A protein has these predicted regions:
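Surface-exposed loops/turns
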Residues: 1-3, 13, 38-39, 52, ...
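Aromatic/hydrophobic beta-strand junction motif of beta-rich domains
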Residues: 5-13, 46
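Solvent-exposed serine/threonine-rich low-complexity stretches and specific carbohydrate-binding patches
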Residues: 29-38
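Short beta-strand/loop motifs in extracellular/secreted proteins, especially
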Residues: 15-18
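C-terminal tail/sorting-segment detector
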Residues: 2-7, 35, 58-86
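Short, glycine-anchored, charge-dense loop/turn motifs used at functional sites
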Residues: 22-29, 61
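Signal that preferentially marks extracellular ectodomain short beta-strand elements
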Residues: 43-56, 69
Length: 86
């Protein structure tokens, strides 16, 4: 990746948001957050590195974004594939 991967989304309420990156076999390689974010247009950036700061190899990974509302009850999940190409 020459640039950070940027995930863009809209929150209808204030929420605690976490981004996780997994291998296709389900191994967690990176977790960002949780971090509090206000309602509205939001972005999270990921630099292509694992938890130890190493650049991930080219390939396909899975991302998951979880947003938990201030009440601790409401939860929204987004997930999908992510390709790393350098």
């Amino acid at each position: 990746m020459r640039q950070d991967a940027v995930f863009t989304y809209v929150l209808s309420h204030d929420a605690s948001v976490e981004l996780a990156i997994y291998t296709l076999s389900g191994r967690l390689v990176c977790r960002l957050g949780p971090q509090g974010q206000p309602a509205g247009f939001q972005q999270l950036s990921w630099d292509g590195r694992d938890q130890s700061g190493r650049l991930l190899a080219n390939g396909t990974y899975l991302y998951r974004i979880v947003a938990v509302g201030g009440d601790g009850e409401s939860e929204v999940r987004f997930r999908g594939p992510l390709s790393v190409l350098r």
